[in-house]
Protein backbone atom coordinates (compact mmCIF):
# COMPACT_ATOMS: atom_id res chain seq x y z
CA UNK A 1 0.00 0.00 0.00
CA UNK A 2 2.95 2.35 0.53
CA UNK A 3 3.44 2.79 -3.22
CA UNK A 4 -0.19 3.67 -3.95
CA UNK A 5 -0.95 7.15 -5.21
CA UNK A 6 -3.14 9.29 -2.96
CA UNK A 7 -6.10 8.69 -5.26
CA UNK A 8 -5.50 4.92 -5.03
CA UNK A 9 -5.20 5.09 -1.25
CA UNK A 10 -8.40 7.11 -1.01
CA UNK A 11 -10.28 4.69 -3.25
CA UNK A 12 -8.98 1.66 -1.33
CA UNK A 13 -9.97 3.19 2.01
CA UNK A 14 -13.45 4.11 0.76
CA UNK A 15 -13.84 0.59 -0.69
CA UNK A 16 -12.70 -0.90 2.63
CA UNK A 17 -9.83 -2.82 0.99
CA UNK A 18 -7.83 -1.98 4.11
CA UNK A 19 -8.52 0.25 7.06
CA UNK A 20 -7.10 3.61 8.07
CA UNK A 21 -5.85 1.94 11.25
CA UNK A 22 -3.91 -0.59 9.17
CA UNK A 23 -2.48 2.15 6.95
CA UNK A 24 -1.55 4.35 9.91
CA UNK A 25 0.06 1.45 11.79
CA UNK A 26 2.01 0.58 8.65
CA UNK A 27 3.37 4.15 8.50
CA UNK A 28 4.27 4.07 12.20
CA UNK A 29 6.15 0.79 11.67
CA UNK A 30 8.00 2.28 8.69
CA UNK A 31 9.00 5.33 10.72
CA UNK A 32 10.21 3.17 13.61
CA UNK A 33 12.26 0.93 11.30
CA UNK A 34 13.86 3.93 9.59
CA UNK A 35 14.87 5.95 12.63
CA UNK A 36 18.35 6.35 11.16
CA UNK A 37 16.88 8.77 8.59
CA UNK A 38 16.09 11.09 11.53
CA UNK A 39 13.17 12.44 9.52
CA UNK A 40 10.90 13.10 12.51
CA UNK A 41 11.26 15.31 15.56
CA UNK A 42 8.02 14.19 17.20
CA UNK A 43 5.43 11.45 16.69
CA UNK A 44 1.82 11.30 17.88
CA UNK A 45 1.24 7.56 17.48
CA UNK A 46 -1.60 7.01 19.96
CA UNK A 47 -3.58 10.02 18.77
CA UNK A 48 -2.97 9.07 15.12
CA UNK A 49 -4.40 5.60 15.73
CA UNK A 50 -7.41 7.08 17.56
CA UNK A 51 -8.07 9.40 14.63
CA UNK A 52 -7.65 6.46 12.24
CA UNK A 53 -10.35 4.56 14.15
CA UNK A 54 -12.65 7.57 13.85
CA UNK A 55 -11.85 7.81 10.13
CA UNK A 56 -12.76 4.16 9.66
CA UNK A 57 -16.19 4.78 11.18
CA UNK A 58 -16.74 7.71 8.82
CA UNK A 59 -15.64 5.61 5.84
CA UNK A 60 -17.80 2.68 6.95
CA UNK A 61 -20.82 4.98 6.77
CA UNK A 62 -19.97 5.79 3.16
CA UNK A 63 -18.88 9.28 4.03
CA UNK A 64 -15.48 10.90 4.12
CA UNK A 65 -13.44 13.16 1.90
CA UNK A 66 -10.55 12.34 -0.47
CA UNK A 67 -7.93 12.62 2.31
CA UNK A 68 -10.01 10.96 5.05
CA UNK A 69 -7.95 8.36 6.90
CA UNK A 70 -4.67 9.09 5.11
CA UNK A 71 -1.63 9.69 7.36
CA UNK A 72 0.69 12.63 6.70
CA UNK A 73 3.62 14.52 8.22
CA UNK A 74 4.03 18.21 9.01
CA UNK A 75 7.22 20.27 8.99
CA UNK A 76 7.94 21.31 12.57
CA UNK A 77 7.32 25.02 12.06
CA UNK A 78 3.53 24.80 11.82
CA UNK A 79 1.85 25.45 15.15
CA UNK A 80 -0.02 22.51 16.68
CA UNK A 81 -1.91 22.38 19.96
CA UNK A 82 -0.98 18.77 20.72
CA UNK A 83 2.68 18.59 19.71
CA UNK A 84 5.58 20.91 20.40
CA UNK A 85 6.55 23.32 17.63
CA UNK A 86 10.34 23.44 17.81
CA UNK A 87 11.50 24.82 14.45
CA UNK A 88 14.39 22.37 15.06
CA UNK A 89 15.88 24.88 17.50
CA UNK A 90 16.99 24.74 21.11
CA UNK A 91 15.24 28.11 21.39
CA UNK A 92 11.81 26.44 20.96
CA UNK A 93 12.64 22.88 22.02
CA UNK A 94 9.84 22.88 24.61
CA UNK A 95 7.40 25.32 23.01
CA UNK A 96 3.79 24.21 22.64
CA UNK A 97 1.51 26.54 20.71
CA UNK A 98 -1.94 27.38 22.14
CA UNK A 99 -3.55 27.04 18.70
CA UNK A 100 -3.39 25.13 15.41
CA UNK A 101 -2.09 26.72 12.23
CA UNK A 102 -4.74 27.21 9.53
CA UNK A 103 -3.13 24.51 7.40
CA UNK A 104 -3.41 22.07 10.34
CA UNK A 105 -7.08 22.95 10.81
CA UNK A 106 -7.74 22.36 7.10
CA UNK A 107 -6.18 18.90 7.19
CA UNK A 108 -8.23 17.98 10.25
CA UNK A 109 -11.39 19.20 8.51
CA UNK A 110 -10.51 17.02 5.52
CA UNK A 111 -9.91 13.92 7.62
CA UNK A 112 -6.14 13.61 7.15
CA UNK A 113 -4.18 12.17 10.07
CA UNK A 114 -1.11 14.09 11.26
CA UNK A 115 1.22 11.32 12.38
CA UNK A 116 4.08 13.56 13.47
CA UNK A 117 6.26 16.57 12.80
CA UNK A 118 9.37 16.43 10.68
CA UNK A 119 12.96 17.54 11.13
CA UNK A 120 14.23 20.64 9.34
CA UNK A 121 17.01 23.19 9.26
CA UNK A 122 16.73 25.44 12.31
CA UNK A 123 14.08 28.11 11.69
CA UNK A 124 14.08 26.92 8.04
CA UNK A 125 17.56 28.37 7.45
CA UNK A 126 19.65 25.96 5.41
CA UNK A 127 19.92 23.88 2.26
CA UNK A 128 21.05 20.55 3.70
CA UNK A 129 19.10 19.86 6.91
CA UNK A 130 22.38 19.78 8.83
CA UNK A 131 21.46 22.87 10.88
CA UNK A 132 18.98 21.11 13.16
CA UNK A 133 19.25 21.04 16.95
CA UNK A 134 17.93 17.47 16.66
CA UNK A 135 20.63 16.25 14.27
CA UNK A 136 20.99 15.87 10.51
CA UNK A 137 18.43 14.15 8.32
CA UNK A 138 19.75 11.53 5.90
CA UNK A 139 18.78 11.02 2.27
CA UNK A 140 16.88 7.73 1.67
CA UNK A 141 18.76 7.25 -1.61
CA UNK A 142 22.16 7.41 0.12
CA UNK A 143 22.31 7.74 3.87
CA UNK A 144 25.72 9.42 3.64
CA UNK A 145 24.17 12.34 1.76
CA UNK A 146 21.92 15.26 2.64
CA UNK A 147 18.21 15.28 1.78
CA UNK A 148 18.27 19.01 1.00
CA UNK A 149 16.81 21.75 3.12
CA UNK A 150 15.24 23.26 4.86
CA UNK A 151 12.30 20.82 4.60
CA UNK A 152 14.59 17.78 4.51
CA UNK A 153 12.63 15.73 7.03
CA UNK A 154 9.39 16.05 5.08
CA UNK A 155 11.13 15.14 1.81
CA UNK A 156 12.94 12.16 3.33
CA UNK A 157 9.72 10.91 4.92
CA UNK A 158 7.92 10.87 1.57
CA UNK A 159 10.88 9.53 -0.44
CA UNK A 160 11.40 6.75 2.10
CA UNK A 161 7.67 5.89 1.94
CA UNK A 162 7.27 6.60 5.66
CA UNK A 163 4.14 8.65 4.87
CA UNK A 164 2.12 9.15 1.67
CA UNK A 165 2.61 12.92 1.74
CA UNK A 166 4.04 15.72 3.84
CA UNK A 167 3.97 19.50 4.16
CA UNK A 168 6.97 21.80 4.03
CA UNK A 169 7.68 25.49 3.65
CA UNK A 170 9.58 27.25 0.88
CA UNK A 171 11.36 30.58 1.43
CA UNK A 172 14.03 30.25 -1.25
CA UNK A 173 13.71 26.66 -2.44
CA UNK A 174 13.07 24.70 0.75
CA UNK A 175 10.40 22.51 -0.85
CA UNK A 176 11.78 22.21 -4.37
CA UNK A 177 15.45 21.58 -3.53
CA UNK A 178 14.75 18.68 -1.10
CA UNK A 179 12.20 17.30 -3.57
CA UNK A 180 14.95 17.25 -6.22
CA UNK A 181 17.55 15.69 -3.90
CA UNK A 182 15.09 13.02 -2.72
CA UNK A 183 13.51 12.18 -6.09
CA UNK A 184 9.94 13.25 -5.32
CA UNK A 185 7.54 16.00 -6.39
CA UNK A 186 7.09 19.27 -4.50
CA UNK A 187 5.36 22.56 -5.25
CA UNK A 188 5.81 26.09 -3.92
CA UNK A 189 2.47 27.78 -4.52
CA UNK A 190 1.95 31.42 -5.46
CA UNK A 191 2.56 33.73 -2.52
CA UNK A 192 -0.78 34.16 -0.75
CA UNK A 193 -2.47 31.03 -2.11
CA UNK A 194 -1.91 29.02 1.09
CA UNK A 195 -2.37 30.61 4.52
CA UNK A 196 0.73 31.37 6.57
CA UNK A 197 -1.25 31.77 9.80
CA UNK A 198 0.44 29.62 12.43
CA UNK A 199 3.57 29.07 10.34
CA UNK A 200 6.60 30.34 12.26
CA UNK A 201 8.13 33.10 10.15
CA UNK A 202 11.62 33.17 8.63
CA UNK A 203 11.19 35.84 5.94
CA UNK A 204 7.56 36.90 5.80
CA UNK A 205 7.52 38.27 2.24
CA UNK A 206 9.08 35.06 0.90
CA UNK A 207 7.67 32.20 3.02
CA UNK A 208 5.04 29.90 1.54
CA UNK A 209 3.69 26.49 2.60
CA UNK A 210 3.38 23.63 0.15
CA UNK A 211 3.18 19.84 -0.22
CA UNK A 212 5.56 16.96 -0.99
CA UNK A 213 4.28 13.79 -2.66
CA UNK A 214 5.36 11.19 -5.19
CA UNK A 215 3.56 12.77 -8.15
CA UNK A 216 1.99 15.95 -9.51
CA UNK A 217 -1.37 14.19 -9.38
CA UNK A 218 -0.95 13.75 -5.62
CA UNK A 219 0.17 17.37 -5.22
CA UNK A 220 -3.02 18.54 -6.94
CA UNK A 221 -5.15 16.61 -4.48
CA UNK A 222 -3.32 18.10 -1.47
CA UNK A 223 -3.16 21.65 -2.80
CA UNK A 224 -6.92 21.71 -3.34
CA UNK A 225 -7.29 20.93 0.37
CA UNK A 226 -4.98 23.68 1.70
CA UNK A 227 -5.38 26.55 -0.79
CA UNK A 228 -7.80 29.38 -0.17
CA UNK A 229 -8.41 32.69 1.55
CA UNK A 230 -7.81 33.04 5.28
CA UNK A 231 -8.88 36.18 7.12
CA UNK A 232 -6.24 35.44 9.76
CA UNK A 233 -3.46 35.99 7.19
CA UNK A 234 -3.25 39.56 5.88
CA UNK A 235 -1.29 38.37 2.82
CA UNK A 236 -3.84 35.71 1.88
CA UNK A 237 -5.28 36.00 -1.63
CA UNK A 238 -9.07 36.01 -1.94
CA UNK A 239 -9.56 33.92 -5.08
CA UNK A 240 -11.75 31.12 -6.33
CA UNK A 241 -9.78 27.88 -5.96
CA UNK A 242 -10.17 25.44 -8.87
CA UNK A 243 -10.35 21.69 -8.38
CA UNK A 244 -6.73 20.96 -9.26
CA UNK A 245 -7.36 17.21 -9.49
CA UNK A 246 -9.90 17.87 -12.25
CA UNK A 247 -7.78 20.55 -13.92
CA UNK A 248 -4.73 18.30 -14.42
CA UNK A 249 -6.81 15.78 -16.35
CA UNK A 250 -7.77 18.28 -19.01
CA UNK A 251 -5.89 17.99 -22.33
CA UNK A 252 -2.56 19.81 -22.32
CA UNK A 253 -1.83 21.35 -25.69
CA UNK A 254 0.17 24.20 -27.17
CA UNK A 255 2.66 24.27 -24.31
CA UNK A 256 5.20 27.07 -24.69
CA UNK A 257 8.33 26.39 -22.67
CA UNK A 258 10.93 29.04 -21.93
CA UNK A 259 14.46 27.64 -21.75
CA UNK A 260 17.10 29.98 -20.25
CA UNK A 261 20.66 29.46 -21.47
CA UNK A 262 21.98 30.75 -18.13
CA UNK A 263 20.65 27.61 -16.43
CA UNK A 264 23.26 25.52 -18.24
CA UNK A 265 26.45 26.89 -16.74
CA UNK A 266 29.70 24.98 -16.09
CA UNK A 267 28.89 24.69 -12.38
CA UNK A 268 25.78 22.67 -13.25
CA UNK A 269 26.72 18.98 -13.25
CA UNK A 270 26.84 17.47 -16.74
CA UNK A 271 24.48 14.66 -15.77
CA UNK A 272 21.90 17.21 -14.70
CA UNK A 273 22.28 19.21 -17.91
CA UNK A 274 21.85 16.02 -19.96
CA UNK A 275 18.74 15.02 -18.00
CA UNK A 276 17.15 18.44 -18.50
CA UNK A 277 17.92 18.39 -22.23
CA UNK A 278 16.34 14.91 -22.43
CA UNK A 279 13.22 16.29 -20.74
CA UNK A 280 13.13 19.18 -23.22
CA UNK A 281 13.33 16.70 -26.12
CA UNK A 282 10.44 14.71 -24.66
CA UNK A 283 8.33 17.85 -24.33
CA UNK A 284 9.18 18.69 -27.96
CA UNK A 285 8.12 15.21 -29.06
CA UNK A 286 4.85 15.76 -27.19
CA UNK A 287 4.22 18.90 -29.20
CA UNK A 288 5.59 21.64 -26.96
CA UNK A 289 7.20 24.75 -28.42
CA UNK A 290 10.64 25.47 -26.94
CA UNK A 291 11.57 29.15 -26.79
CA UNK A 292 15.04 30.27 -25.77
CA UNK A 293 14.86 33.09 -23.24
CA UNK A 294 17.38 35.44 -21.69
CA UNK A 295 17.25 36.05 -17.94
CA UNK A 296 19.58 39.02 -17.76
CA UNK A 297 19.15 39.49 -14.00
CA UNK A 298 19.79 35.86 -13.03
CA UNK A 299 23.27 36.62 -11.56
CA UNK A 300 21.55 38.93 -9.04
CA UNK A 301 19.01 36.39 -7.79
CA UNK A 302 21.04 34.90 -4.93
CA UNK A 303 22.62 38.11 -3.55
CA UNK A 304 19.28 39.93 -3.72
CA UNK A 305 17.52 37.05 -1.99
CA UNK A 306 19.99 36.72 0.87
CA UNK A 307 20.01 40.44 1.66
CA UNK A 308 16.20 40.51 1.92
CA UNK A 309 15.80 37.12 3.60
CA UNK A 310 18.42 37.85 6.27
CA UNK A 311 16.98 41.32 6.92
CA UNK A 312 13.51 39.88 7.48
CA UNK A 313 14.92 37.04 9.58
CA UNK A 314 16.74 39.43 11.91
CA UNK A 315 13.47 41.27 12.46
CA UNK A 316 11.28 38.18 12.87
CA UNK A 317 13.68 36.44 15.25
CA UNK A 318 14.05 39.47 17.52
CA UNK A 319 10.98 38.20 19.43
CA UNK A 320 13.00 35.34 20.94
CA UNK A 321 14.45 37.09 23.98
CA UNK A 322 14.16 34.51 26.76
CA UNK A 323 11.40 36.49 28.45
CA UNK A 324 8.09 35.91 26.67
CA UNK A 325 8.65 32.35 25.46
CA UNK A 326 11.41 30.07 24.27
CA UNK A 327 14.73 29.15 25.86
CA UNK A 328 15.68 31.17 28.94
CA UNK A 329 19.31 31.22 30.07
CA UNK A 330 20.02 30.23 33.66
CA UNK A 331 23.35 32.10 33.69
CA UNK A 332 22.23 35.73 33.81
CA UNK A 333 22.11 38.35 36.55
CA UNK A 334 20.83 41.33 34.53
CA UNK A 335 18.15 41.84 31.88
CA UNK A 336 20.76 42.45 29.17
CA UNK A 337 22.62 39.28 30.16
CA UNK A 338 19.36 37.33 30.12
CA UNK A 339 18.52 38.40 26.57
CA UNK A 340 22.10 38.03 25.31
CA UNK A 341 22.72 34.64 26.90
CA UNK A 342 19.31 33.25 25.97
CA UNK A 343 19.83 34.11 22.31
CA UNK A 344 23.47 32.95 22.31
CA UNK A 345 22.52 29.60 23.84
CA UNK A 346 19.23 29.16 21.98
CA UNK A 347 20.25 29.81 18.38
CA UNK A 348 22.58 27.70 16.24
CA UNK A 349 25.48 29.04 14.16
CA UNK A 350 23.63 29.43 10.85
CA UNK A 351 20.73 31.29 12.45
CA UNK A 352 23.19 33.59 14.23
CA UNK A 353 24.99 34.20 10.94
CA UNK A 354 21.79 35.27 9.21
CA UNK A 355 20.64 37.44 12.11
CA UNK A 356 24.00 39.23 12.08
CA UNK A 357 23.88 39.65 8.29
CA UNK A 358 20.33 40.97 8.45
CA UNK A 359 21.09 43.37 11.27
CA UNK A 360 24.09 44.66 9.32
CA UNK A 361 22.16 45.38 6.11
CA UNK A 362 19.40 47.13 8.08
CA UNK A 363 21.79 49.32 10.07
CA UNK A 364 21.70 53.06 9.42
CA UNK A 365 24.95 53.17 7.48
CA UNK A 366 24.05 50.31 5.15
CA UNK A 367 20.24 50.35 4.77
CA UNK A 368 20.28 52.30 1.49
CA UNK A 369 23.32 50.51 0.07
CA UNK A 370 22.06 46.99 0.75
CA UNK A 371 18.44 46.51 1.82
CA UNK A 372 16.80 49.31 -0.15
CA UNK A 373 18.91 48.48 -3.20
CA UNK A 374 17.97 44.79 -2.92
CA UNK A 375 14.27 45.68 -2.82
CA UNK A 376 14.67 47.69 -6.03
CA UNK A 377 16.48 44.78 -7.68
CA UNK A 378 13.74 42.44 -6.47
CA UNK A 379 11.14 44.50 -8.33
CA UNK A 380 13.27 44.35 -11.50
CA UNK A 381 13.62 40.56 -11.17
CA UNK A 382 9.87 40.22 -10.71
CA UNK A 383 9.13 42.44 -13.71
CA UNK A 384 11.57 40.51 -15.92
CA UNK A 385 10.03 37.14 -15.01
CA UNK A 386 6.46 38.38 -15.46
CA UNK A 387 7.33 39.84 -18.87
CA UNK A 388 8.86 36.54 -20.00
CA UNK A 389 5.92 34.52 -18.62
CA UNK A 390 3.56 36.62 -20.72
CA UNK A 391 5.04 34.88 -23.78
CA UNK A 392 5.58 31.35 -22.39
CA UNK A 393 3.59 29.01 -20.12
CA UNK A 394 6.50 27.93 -17.97
CA UNK A 395 10.21 28.51 -17.48
CA UNK A 396 11.99 25.15 -17.42
CA UNK A 397 15.36 24.26 -15.95
CA UNK A 398 17.17 22.21 -13.34
CA UNK A 399 15.97 22.57 -9.77
CA UNK A 400 19.52 22.38 -8.42
CA UNK A 401 23.03 22.68 -9.92
CA UNK A 402 24.16 19.42 -8.24
CA UNK A 403 22.70 16.20 -6.96
CA UNK A 404 22.65 15.57 -3.20
CA UNK A 405 26.07 16.23 -1.68
CA UNK A 406 27.66 14.34 1.19
CA UNK A 407 26.86 15.10 4.81
CA UNK A 408 29.45 17.53 6.16
CA UNK A 409 30.77 18.41 2.70
CA UNK A 410 29.53 22.02 2.66
CA UNK A 411 28.55 22.71 6.26
CA UNK A 412 31.61 24.91 6.84
CA UNK A 413 31.17 26.82 3.57
CA UNK A 414 27.94 28.84 3.80
CA UNK A 415 28.40 30.38 0.34
CA UNK A 416 28.40 26.94 -1.32
CA UNK A 417 25.32 26.03 0.69
CA UNK A 418 23.57 29.23 -0.42
CA UNK A 419 24.38 28.51 -4.07
CA UNK A 420 22.34 25.31 -3.86
CA UNK A 421 19.34 27.66 -4.20
CA UNK A 422 20.65 29.45 -7.29
CA UNK A 423 17.72 28.34 -9.50
CA UNK A 424 14.95 28.41 -6.91
CA UNK A 425 15.08 31.78 -5.11
CA UNK A 426 13.62 33.79 -8.01
CA UNK A 427 10.17 32.23 -7.62
CA UNK A 428 10.10 33.45 -4.01
CA UNK A 429 11.38 36.92 -4.87
CA UNK A 430 8.61 37.26 -7.48
CA UNK A 431 5.92 35.35 -5.56
CA UNK A 432 5.52 32.89 -8.45
CA UNK A 433 4.50 29.22 -8.28
CA UNK A 434 7.16 26.63 -9.08
CA UNK A 435 7.27 22.85 -9.00
CA UNK A 436 10.08 20.30 -8.91
CA UNK A 437 9.54 16.83 -10.35
CA UNK A 438 11.96 13.90 -10.81
CA UNK A 439 13.66 13.67 -14.19
CA UNK A 440 16.40 11.06 -13.94
CA UNK A 441 19.48 10.00 -12.03
CA UNK A 442 23.20 10.70 -11.93
CA UNK A 443 25.30 8.10 -10.11
CA UNK A 444 22.09 6.67 -8.61
CA UNK A 445 21.14 10.08 -7.18
CA UNK A 446 17.87 11.79 -8.20
CA UNK A 447 17.72 14.85 -10.46
CA UNK A 448 14.97 17.45 -10.27
CA UNK A 449 13.28 19.39 -13.07
CA UNK A 450 11.81 22.78 -12.16
CA UNK A 451 8.86 24.46 -13.85
CA UNK A 452 8.00 28.06 -12.92
CA UNK A 453 4.73 29.67 -13.97
CA UNK A 454 2.61 32.80 -13.81
CA UNK A 455 0.96 33.95 -10.59
CA UNK A 456 -1.91 31.61 -9.64
CA UNK A 457 -1.24 29.28 -12.60
CA UNK A 458 -0.93 26.19 -10.38
CA UNK A 459 -3.58 24.40 -12.45
CA UNK A 460 -1.51 24.79 -15.63
CA UNK A 461 1.77 24.06 -13.84
CA UNK A 462 0.44 20.86 -12.29
CA UNK A 463 -1.16 19.81 -15.58
CA UNK A 464 2.15 20.17 -17.45
CA UNK A 465 4.02 18.28 -14.71
CA UNK A 466 1.35 15.54 -14.73
CA UNK A 467 1.56 15.37 -18.54
CA UNK A 468 5.32 14.79 -18.24
CA UNK A 469 4.87 12.13 -15.57
CA UNK A 470 2.35 10.27 -17.72
CA UNK A 471 5.15 9.75 -20.23
CA UNK A 472 7.99 9.00 -17.78
CA UNK A 473 8.50 6.74 -14.78
CA UNK A 474 11.04 8.77 -12.80
CA UNK A 475 8.45 9.60 -10.12
CA UNK A 476 7.83 5.88 -9.56
CA UNK A 477 11.45 5.15 -8.59
CA UNK A 478 11.89 3.85 -5.06
CA UNK A 479 15.10 4.07 -2.98
CA UNK A 480 14.19 0.76 -1.35
CA UNK A 481 14.42 -1.00 -4.72
CA UNK A 482 17.79 0.25 -5.95
CA UNK A 483 19.88 -2.19 -7.88
Curated annotation (Swiss-Prot):
Gene3D superfamilies to which the protein is assigned, alphabetical: Amidase signature (AS) domain (3.90.1300.10)
Q: Coiled-coil intervals in this record?
A: none
Catalytic class of the enzyme? ligase
Q: Which SUPFAM superfamilies match?
A: Amidase signature (AS) enzymes
* Superkingdom, taxonomy of origin: Bacteria
Its EC number is 6.3.5.7
What's an example GO cellular component term for this entry? glutamyl-tRNA(Gln) amidotransferase complex
InterPro entries from the UniProt entry: Amidase, Amidase_CS, Amidase_dom, AS_sf, GatA
Q: Which reaction does this chain catalyze?
A: L-glutamyl-tRNA(Gln) + L-glutamine + ATP + H2O = L-glutaminyl-tRNA(Gln) + L-glutamate + ADP + phosphate + H(+)
The subunit structure is: Heterotrimer of A, B and C subunits.
Known PANTHER family for this protein?
A: GLUTAMYL-TRNA(GLN) AMIDOTRANSFERASE SUBUNIT A (PTHR11895:SF151), TRANSAMIDASE (PTHR11895)
Family that this chain belongs to: Belongs to the amidase family. GatA subfamily.
Q: What is this protein called?
A: Glutamyl-tRNA(Gln) amidotransferase subunit A
Specify the species. Answer: Legionella pneumophila (strain Lens)
Name the lineage.
Answer: Bacteria, Pseudomonadati, Pseudomonadota, Gammaproteobacteria, Legionellales
Gene expressing this chain: gatA
